[in-house]
């Protein structure tokens, strides 16, 4: 930076406001520099290299005895290619009150954005804040794309935290979704786009917000300017690289438990840049198994259906009824015990009782339930034939957003 004239006393205070997500760093890493020209004005220029447009937001919380060439706060969309930047530069220079001095040593990739011109015989002072983000600011209400569920075709996973979730889904993550994928489960692209961010070096995770920056992620830029954000991947769990084009349904990587997470899962959201250089998640809808539009709900499980996928037979826990087991009697090997057997389909638990004795028994079953409802009540009495399994009840959560548990006790006596 060239020296300022002796008549000017200038205090420079820079603040870089990073576009930081709870679930990953989304800052494209641009620079904002300045030089003083021989005309006394201070010229600010950007240096950005990328594969998609970048938005730079600038404000001056303090500006004393300096005349800006543009009103503030102000934002600029900086295109990724040098040819496009040169075209933008021509229009920006036309907005300056005077052309920059010819001896101003701006780097070849520097894009002059604005200037500050000191007022005569005055001490000057300014504080500047700026923020780079990917993409072009847009109206978050203008998106109506239907997404694929981000897991393999024919598989089903549950929404464990939805829009406005109390654990982490607020602020810019207001419209995020958590799916109960386990460590190593495949993640697939919910929509086609260009990969513009990958982090996969972390092996740290936990429920505290102190782990937020450790979340591995893949960030995909869509053709309408929105971004698909896939978070909590396992270490070295990304199969794509920055610059790759991915198709909807394509395998991206593997789920994990990194970053701020109380357990393994996939965090997915769609976000758009805002005019103040930040990000805002937007509500998303998905294509259902039967081609209908789905607004995802906490506690419900959904099948992924991808174009070209093989037909499969779906099974939903919510569709199971006691009537499906009317007259159910299943032979079991001979043994010396009464045993409870359970099956879990989505958030529905099917409860069976096996009598492996070579004798029929009268059995009274008592259920101790936490946040669960039994379709047969908490006390069930059954006569169970020898070496036979019988159906007892269905258990479903009263509130899918809370945890649930059950304890089953029974007493029995042989039938004459």
Where do the PLM segments sit?
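Intrinsically disordered, low-complexity Pro/Gly/Ser/Thr-rich segments with frequent PxxP/GP/PP motifs
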Residues: 67-121, 372-401
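Bacterial N-terminal signal peptides
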Residues: 10-19
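Short histidine-centered loop motifs in beta-beta connectors
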Residues: 182, 188, 225-249
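Acidic, glycine-rich catalytic/binding loops that coordinate metals and/or anionic ligands
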Residues: 145-147, 151, 160, 239-241, ...
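Surface-exposed, glycine-biased beta-strand/turn segments
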Residues: 105-108, 112-215, 321-343, 359-360, ...
């Amino acid at each position: 930076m060239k020296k300022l004239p002796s008549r000017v006393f200038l205090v420079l205070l820079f603040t870089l406001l990073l576009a930081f997500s709870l679930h990953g760093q989304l800052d494209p890493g641009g620079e904002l520099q300045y030089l003083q020209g021989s005309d006394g004005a201070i010229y600010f220029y950007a240096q950005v290299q990328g594969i998609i447009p970048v938005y730079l937001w600038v404000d001056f919380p303090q500006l004393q005895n300096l005349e800006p060439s543009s009103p503030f706060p102000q934002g600029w969309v900086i295109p990724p290619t040098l040819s496009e930047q040169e075209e933008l530069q021509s229009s920006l220079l036309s907005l300056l009150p005077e052309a920059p001095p010819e001896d101003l040593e701006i780097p070849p990739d520097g894009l002059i954005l604005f200037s500050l011109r000191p007022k005569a015989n005055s001490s000057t002072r300014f504080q500047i804040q700026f923020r780079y983000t990917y993409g072009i600011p847009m109206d978050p209400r203008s998106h109506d794309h239907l997404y694929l569920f981000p897991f393999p075709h024919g598989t089903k996973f549950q929404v464990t935290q939805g829009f406005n979730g109390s654990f982490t889904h607020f602020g810019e993550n207001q419209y995020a979704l958590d799916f109960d994928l386990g460590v190593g489960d495949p993640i697939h692209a919910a929509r086609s786009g260009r990969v513009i961010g990958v982090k996969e070096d972390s092996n740290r995770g936990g429920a505290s917000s102190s782990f937020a920056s450790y979340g591995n992620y893949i960030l995909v830029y869509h053709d309408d300017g929105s971004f698909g954000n896939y978070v909590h991947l396992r270490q070295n769990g990304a199969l794509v690289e920055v610059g790759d084009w991915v198709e909807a349904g394509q395998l991206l990587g593997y789920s994990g438990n990194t970053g701020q997470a109380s357990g393994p899962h996939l965090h997915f959201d769609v976000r758009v840049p805002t005019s103040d250089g930040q990000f805002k998640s937007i509500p998303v809808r998905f294509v259902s198994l039967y081609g209908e539009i789905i607004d995802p709900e906490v506690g419900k499980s959904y099948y992924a259906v991808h174009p070209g996928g093989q037909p499969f037979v779906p099974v939903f826990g919510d569709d199971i009824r006691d009537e499906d087991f009317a007259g159910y009697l299943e032979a079991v090997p001979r043994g010396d015990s009464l045993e409870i057997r359970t099956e879990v389909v989505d958030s529905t638990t099917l409860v069976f009782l096996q009598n492996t004795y070579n004798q029929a028994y009268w059995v009274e079953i008592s259920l101790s339930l936490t946040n669960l409802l039994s379709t047969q009540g908490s006390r069930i009495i059954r006569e169970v034939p020898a070496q036979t399994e019988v159906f007892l009840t269905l258990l479903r959560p009263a509130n899918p957003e809370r945890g649930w548990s059950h304890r089953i006790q029974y007493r029995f006596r042989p039938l004459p």
